[in-house]
Amino acid sequence: MPANSALRRITKKALYSLLGDSSYKYFQAASKAMDIRNGSWSEPELELIPFAIRPGETALDLGANFGLYSYHISRALGAAGRVYAFEPVPFTFETLQLVAKILRFKNVTRFEKGCGEKAGKISFEVPVQASGAFAAGQAYIGGRRDDREGKETQVRWASTREVVCEVIRLDDFLPEINELSLIKCDIEGAELFAFRGARKLIGKHLPTVICEINPWFLEGFGVRLEELTAFFFDQDYRLYHYRSQDGESALVPVETRDVVEDNYVFIHPQRLSRFASILVGGA
């Protein structure tokens, strides 16, 4: 059954109504683990992982959700490598733990925490689907202004549930990690806050950063797109968009003005050689 088929959505709604939160997570974990393993849940940028990292290095998965990126990064890093995965929402984290058990994550350290500019307890809003189940991948830090122009296309839920989660600063929480080569970040508009809290780590290691960028969500936090890209441009990073179609793959340079809602890749010149075979314009 495809990962987002109509039949599957109907099945999930029925099961959630029958099982409720506490038991539904077992079904959710089993189905997500199957999707991850067989590739029916995927993103094009997963193809960049073998370019970005080497066995034995370290990676961060911010907004780990149910472990899609953690799984693929873990396999590429090998037994000597390490993934640190952060997922603050309790239901999602519990499901991630089950997925990790099913898929036998060996080198993924998981934390029930979010990442931000300041440490503390923070309210998150978790969208609720028509079935009553959480839309876990769309949870966001409270305070984002969604009741504004553009809501019709960006807000795909009728209600949210508030949960209080712990947020840490990565510079304080993981000051001694070695060989940080990749950060994946997808936290629904709060990406710049996480990066500011990891300023020292990023400046020291200059990791490749795979980041979802949604300008509308950024604006909801009072952040301009230019502020996000400038954080990296000020450290000499370059911005790319990954295109993969009909067997052809390419990393294409992008200007800030051309950014729309999608995944993007920030790469420092020191790491460009790793991507030389797919870089448009060369390293």
Spans of features found by a protein language model:
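Phosphate/nucleotide-binding beta-alpha loop and adjacent structural elements of enzyme active sites
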Residues: 1-283
